[in-house]
Amino acid sequence: MKLEHPDRLMKRTPLSLAALETHDAFAERHIGPDAASQQAMLDTLGFATRAALIDAVIPASIRRAETLPLGPFAQPLSEAEALAALRELADKNQVFRSYIGQGYYDTHTPAVILRNVLENPAWYTAYTPYQPEISQGRLEALLNFQQMVADLTGLEISNASLLDEATAAAEAMTLLQRVGKPQSNVFYVADDVLPQTLEVIKTRAKPIGIEVKSGPAADAAAANAFGVLLQYPGVNGDVRDYRALADAIHAAGGHVVVAADILALTVLTPPGEWGADVAVGNTQRFGVPMGFGGPHAAYMAVRDEFKRQMPGRLVGVTVDAQGKPALRLALQTREQHIRREKATSNVCTAQALLAIMASMYAVYHGPRGLKTIALRVNRIAALVAAGVKQLGFATVNDTFFDTLTIDTGARTAQIHALANAKRINLRRVSDTRVGISVDETTTRGDLAELLGVFAQAAGGTAPDVDALDAGLADTAALPAGLQRTSAYLTHHVFNRHHSETEMLRYLRSLSDKDLALDRSMIPLGSCTMKLNATSEMLPVTWPEFGRIHPFAPAEQTVGYREMIDQLEQMLVAATGYAAVSLQPNAGSQGEYAGLLIIHAYHESRGESHRNVCLIPASAHGTNPASAHMAGMKVVVVACDAQGNVDIDDLKAKAEQHANDLAAIMITYPSTHGVFEQNVREICEIVHAHGGQVYVDGANMNAMVGLTAPGQFGGDVSHLNLHKTFCIPHGGGGPGVGPVAVGAHLAKFLPNQRSTGYARAEDGIGAVSAAPYGSASILPISWMYIAMMGAKNLTAATETAILNANYIAKRLAPHYPVLYSGPGGLVAHECILDLRPIKDSSGITVDDVAKRLMDYGFHAPTMSFPVPGTLMVEPTESESQEELDRFVAAMIAIRDEIRAVEEGRADREDNPLRHAPHTAAVVTANEWPHAYSREQAAYPVASLVANKYWPPVGRADNAYGDRNLFCSCVPVSDYA
């Protein structure tokens, strides 16, 4: 119910409680334009109502007949009510002291990082740093991450994060397949690798014909494998010397991947020093909560010779137009948005925000602080070992960093029961063994309590911790030959910001360099940069969500699983499908899972030969990259002059491949920003030829409440919760990419059998390390849907379409709108064609993007899906005032271009070619340009009151790739 104007309320008598209550208050804050603004925009478009506009935009044949069936969430909750309801669910979780380990550890998030990174919209609302000039802060933080990982692993170069340790290991496998010996298709996994990692590797290997063998590490050299994966330390705690083994593997023509504990590497010889070619792992224990499995930043580091084969994003150093150091994403030609099915990986969004947290943890503690934490953890583990031995138990491993495997024999069940009574979780290794992994949060009191459990089981008295400590030799459990001697984190950034004052100011200095949603609209097409409301973000830091281990017993995670079940049903309602899995921890992984599900379906019908995937020429690069990873053959379907799928070409190719057609991948609305009229026909053609229909959910923000892929012919879709459902982009992650399926595919949804999570009888293997992927950020989407309710979710979709059409209408006289549907209308985004401008003036789309920075805007999506264009998506969250500000900037830029066209401005010496303009350039003693300083920096009057200054001039991309440098820059270079 919308609140009336206070003056009108005061005149009404009598006032009622109902008249004063509102449950739509959140929706009115989430949706940018108020009723008056919406009507003004509708008037501009020539429509009387929003409903009339929607009727003209969306084909009647696919319109949803019913209101979103959200059940108990059909009516919106207020922010307070939603937080209270989620608190009830959170309180059903039980936060036990976790000693489970297996790749996940409790950790202390420094408060200065919690408040100023994780809870700071300047960091979490930013987009992937494709526009480097306005992304220098997070690029520096990610460069710190790369330096940290390279130093700790002892390898030459690291990427800027991957999704989790298991998928990073799978990516390493495919990397080594590309560079390894061609006569082998075997990848060997040591039997002490994390079980969830092995399962993800098997899932990834099967469709591309890699044979995975697992056994003792000692047998790896004889396996004739192109690659070998070793865990360091092993899952049961052993710290083994693999130097001779690595030499033997190399002598046999193979390569070595090491999954290494990031904290252990501060005290153990790094894998790069004993023969590893690739190192992978998780940085979660560097200040990032366990979060029931994620999100966390995985890492990959490689030898220099493999840098161009490395997946994921890579930050490199270049120079700007003034010759000063500038950071940028390097070697982008490896990535799916350029290489498509030939890309090194389908990964887009990774885990930038979590990588930034982990890097700042290292910056804050420095090398000395990290080593102190590691030595303390190792000391506590040694005290546990000494204590249980004193009580008569034997440890299986004599060498260890933080993990012990203990022979407990017939007393195993009793020990688990006693531990449970004290709210302690131990790892269930077997019926006769338990595992204990300690971490930086383990206290002296925890240690005494833990030893008390074993003492009670043994019928004895717990040893005194101080007495144990006094009698224990130094680093007795770390093999002498594997104790680290090489220096690490020597760069000044890791040795300067150790007081909270210094750290606070460093974080502020970085965030001030960047342009995020807290400053202005980010109109990136196909990215849906909408509001990430504060109330949605608050639960992410609740310990009832953050301190839960992903493999905690089910009875301790009741609230989590209820919330997840509810969110799955919300997404079922939104998509029109029958079931949803939240395991995929990025859109790329949801896409990949969907294709594996399609393959499993065909296989179950005796048609495993179906392997052709039809993909329109306009598709996002992840589509062909994912199809290739799923073992499918990509066949491109042409698009017509209007940007729609060419039906005749589709029919011909469906007929040609009728015997081996697996699927078609379409995006709806299309990547051209249009609701194609014949989408039902497309689905029917593919079904008639034995294929399944994959509908990419990247543009779901134009469909919620109005139409649904599961109702117009889709069989499977992935969603991007970090687009449509308000999880922030985090500067390049985290994301969540649920996979939604029709009833006939539900039994093939992902499982994780290695950890006892069996969701579906014939489910595909795990696609993420944890059963529920990035579980700790799922409350964001739950909150958004609960606070919006069915009616307001639909209103948000309608407003997103209204805003896009308003921008298209206002800018059409200045920039041609490349594609539109009937009546010249678009969906939730529009493509502006700048190609004629280049022909008439020499001004490129890149020039316009950089000039927008001078106006205080992030550029729209450049040259996708059509080179030389800008794709604009305003979302529903932007007000008419902000839309008008963007329109004014674009019109002003068009006037600047016209000056070049008409000869009033030089083709080279003009404000577009030299954009962006930094404060240093504008205030320099010399001004060599024909245009004024004022035109450079303050092209519109509104900037005088609120000016964002890009910290660097235009980055030289070619220089950066020719002179690849991906480590921290010396301070002297900035002088």
From Swiss-Prot:
Q: Which residues carry this modification: N6-(pyridoxal phosphate)lysine?
A: K723
Q: What is this protein called?
A: Glycine dehydrogenase (decarboxylating)
The UniProt entry, under CDD domains, shows: GDC-P
What is its cofactor? Answer: pyridoxal 5'-phosphate
Write down the species.
Answer: Burkholderia thailandensis (strain ATCC 700388 / DSM 13276 / CCUG 48851 / CIP 106301 / E264)
The gene is gcvP
Task: Return the EC number.
Answer: 1.4.4.2
Q: Which UniProt keywords apply?
A: Oxidoreductase, Pyridoxal phosphate
Gene Ontology annotations of biological process type: glycine decarboxylation via glycine cleavage system
Q: What role is this protein assigned?
A: The glycine cleavage system catalyzes the degradation of glycine. The P protein binds the alpha-amino group of glycine through its pyridoxal phosphate cofactor; CO(2) is released and the remaining methylamine moiety is then transferred to the lipoamide cofactor of the H protein.
A GO term from the CC aspect = glycine cleavage complex
Q: Which residues form a coiled coil?
A: none
Which superkingdom does the taxonomy of this entry point to?
Bacteria
Query: How would you summarize the oligomeric state and partners of this protein?
Result: The glycine cleavage system is composed of four proteins: P, T, L and H.
- Known catalysed reaction(s)? N(6)-[(R)-lipoyl]-L-lysyl-[glycine-cleavage complex H protein] + glycine + H(+) = N(6)-[(R)-S(8)-aminomethyldihydrolipoyl]-L-lysyl-[glycine-cleavage complex H protein] + CO2
Gene3D superfamilies, alphabetized:
Aspartate Aminotransferase, domain 1, Type I PLP-dependent aspartate aminotransferase-like (Major domain)
Q: Name one Pfam family in it.
A: GDC-P
Among SUPFAM superfamilies, the record links this protein to:
PLP-dependent transferases (SSF53383)
Provide the GO MF annotations for this entry: glycine binding; glycine dehydrogenase (decarboxylating) activity; pyridoxal phosphate binding
Family, according to the entry, reads as follows: Belongs to the GcvP family.
